[in-house]
């Protein structure tokens, strides 16, 4: 395939989504806001990698980080409208995986 024919926006979207754990982080947040520790334990992801992914997704405008001034401080992560727009894509991947992939 001629590389010049690939849409730059599509290429950027694939670059974002192909980062390890990114799709799973977004998928977890489809259910609603989550705290860091909840995300970390639900995916068996290292804290360092999760922190990197959340920062990347926040910079891309896909995830919102909200700090609640309580004692102790509570921080929740949720999807922005841009992030929620990925729901149909992830649901289709989920359907495809259930039909075509074997459970391990």
Describe each model-derived feature in a short phrase:
Residues 4-49, 73-76:
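N-terminal helix-turn-helix DNA-binding core of bacterial DNA-binding proteins
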Residues 53:
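Residues within the DNA-recognition helix of helix-turn-helix
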Residues 69-92:
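Basic, amphipathic "hinge/linker" alpha-helix immediately C-terminal to the N-terminal HTH DNA-binding motif
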Residues 10, 14, 90-97, 101:
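Hydrophobic alpha-helical core bundles mediating ligand binding, dimerization, or RNAP-core interactions
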